[in-house]
């Protein structure tokens, strides 16, 4: 009985953690989703963004006390502008999806919403982590050895 309880707890912790992509696994996935040079943004830029926003974790969330919004998923897409979490005051939901959809292991909806974000005039500069860690940097290491 004790062994079953421990096994159950281990399985629960894995389910809650979500998918953490390996670097090259994510690079290949993003390439398949057409992210390389989408709106002129290189695959290496997307990889750098995902690394600094979520460390490649689909379940990452971060609460922003200032505007009471939350950033969701592998790209840390914000609930004030892009998705609906049912609790962010004045949410716009420009991607027309529930924020929980951005936390799925299948990143199809997260990619579609990220494409929507960069279609706005601010582009990839909408992400603070990209401006702080990726802009004007050599990003080759993010895709090196991945065959993409």
From Swiss-Prot:
Keyword vocabulary terms for this entry: Antimicrobial, Bacteriolytic enzyme, Disulfide bond, Glycosidase, Hydrolase, Signal
Keyword Hydrolase carried by entry: yes
Disulphide bridges: 24-146, 48-134, 83-99, 95-113
Leader sequence segment: 1-18
SUPFAM superfamilies the record matches: Lysozyme-like
Matching InterPro entries: Glyco_hydro_22 (IPR001916), Glyco_hydro_22_CS (IPR019799), Glyco_hydro_22_lys (IPR000974), Lysozyme-like_dom_sf (IPR023346)
Expression (tissue specificity): Expressed in blood cells.
Domain C-type lysozyme: start-end pairs: 19-148
Catalysed reaction, written as an equation: Hydrolysis of (1->4)-beta-linkages between N-acetylmuramic acid and N-acetyl-D-glucosamine residues in a peptidoglycan and between N-acetyl-D-glucosamine residues in chitodextrins
EC number(s) from the headed UniProt entry: 3.2.1.17
MF terms (GO), sorted A to Z: lysozyme activity
GO biological process: defense response to Gram-negative bacterium; defense response to Gram-positive bacterium; killing of cells of another organism
Matches recorded under Pfam families: Lys (PF00062)
Keyword match Zinc-finger: no
Annotated active site: 53, 71
Assigned protein family: Belongs to the glycosyl hydrolase 22 family.
Described function: Lysozymes have primarily a bacteriolytic function; those in tissues and body fluids are associated with the monocyte-macrophage system and enhance the activity of immunoagents.
The protein's name in its UniProt record: Lysozyme C, non-stomach isozyme
Organism, scientific name: Bos taurus (Bovine)
Lineage per the UniProt record: Eukaryota, Metazoa, Chordata, Craniata, Vertebrata
Name of the encoding gene: LYS
């Amino acid at each position: 009985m004790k062994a079953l309880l421990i096994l159950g707890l281990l399985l629960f912790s894995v389910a809650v953690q979500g998918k953490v992509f390996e670097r090259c696994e994510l690079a290949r996935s993003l390439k398949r989703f057409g992210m390389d040079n989408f709106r002129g943004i290189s695959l290496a830029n997307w990889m750098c963004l995902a690394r600094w926003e979520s460390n490649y974790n689909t379940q990452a969330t971060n609460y922003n006390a200032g505007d009471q919004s939350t950033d969701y998923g592998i790209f840390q897409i914000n609930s004030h502008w892009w998705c609906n979490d049912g609790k962010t005051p004045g949410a716009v939901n420009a991607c027309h999806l529930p924020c929980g959809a951005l936390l799925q292991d299948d990143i199809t909806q997260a990619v579609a919403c990220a494409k929507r974000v960069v279609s706005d005039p601010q582009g990839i500069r909408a992400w603070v982590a990209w401006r702080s860690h990726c802009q004007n940097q050599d990003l080759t290491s993010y895709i090196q050895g991945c065959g993409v």
